[in-house]
Amino acid sequence: MDKSSGELVTLTPNNNNTVQPVALMRLGVFVPTLKSLKNSKKNTLSRTDATEELTRLSLARAEGFDKVEITGPRLDMDNDFKTWVGIIHSFARHNVIGDKVELPFVEFAKLCGIPSSQSSRRLRERISPSLKRIAGTVISFSRTDEKHTREYITHLVQSAYYDTERDIVQLQADPRLFELYQFDRKVLLQLKAINALKRRESAQALYTFIESLPRDPAPISLARLRARLNLKSPVFSQNQTVRRAMEQLREIGYLDYTEIQRGRTKLFCIHYRRPRLKAPNDESKENPLPPSPAEKVSPEMAEKLALLEKLGITLDDLEKLFKSR
């Protein structure tokens, strides 16, 4: 629903865009590859608290689940995200029989953004590991009281089968999670920006997060962007990675921004977003906002902000706390 006009807007995936559930875009489910050999071979199990986003699913509401966690192998942007895009496209474009969808293997590879010119062996080498990682990603819904615990455990994809000789792919989803595939809070994610950011996974990950935000988003803290990338390097190095990724997003024409500081908190003010990487016919529709001037902070407030930073508490954390009350 377009809030400004009241018009119902249907979002349909094609080769240039995909409809992505907002929850998976905001959460750190798909993240950059850990570059260093030391980091790439340890701590590869990712654990994400998805309570705030996924307790809105009818499954969670019906059963009274109040905690949702996503656990599994670290899913990267360069291969795993594109395979997930292929899965979303497959369920959107083909007839779903029961809880399964079947399509030609070559077509599935194209939906994953893999050129058809690649050999069958190279296709398998790219798709097979990604399908294993995605199918190995567990989503658990639970509720615990003083005496008892209830928990429902499922997977991002229940099963995947392919046969290159017969040229088929079969994908099976949990029917109770179909709502996740067709979440009512969707945005249309343009793949043009993803394709323009080949091998720049940090920029790709920040793109999926920023594109999920509402129109005229509030300033985003540097700490929130660090959390979205879920890197293991020192904070100083992570800050450099975030700034480099933001600059890469500006270079391809996706956005413009200003980095400001309020107290001890560094923020990014987004002036506009252009997922098609070109200016609209009417640039006034972008409603660019001037950067907010840095506010003067009293010594008492500066001291409180410094204490919060030492405790690892961000402004985003405080905002969530007040919203939950």
Curated annotation (Swiss-Prot):
Keywords: DNA replication, DNA-binding, Plasmid, Plasmid copy control
Assigned protein family: Belongs to the initiator RepB protein family.
Pfam families: Rep3_N
Function recorded in the entry: This protein is essential for plasmid replication; it is involved in copy control functions. In vitro, binds to the DNA repeat units, BCDD'D'', EFG and HIJ.
GO molecular function: DNA binding; DNA-directed DNA polymerase activity
Top-rank lineage group of the source organism: Bacteria
Segments for region (Disordered): 279-298
UniProt name for this protein: RepFIB replication protein A
Example GO BP: plasmid maintenance
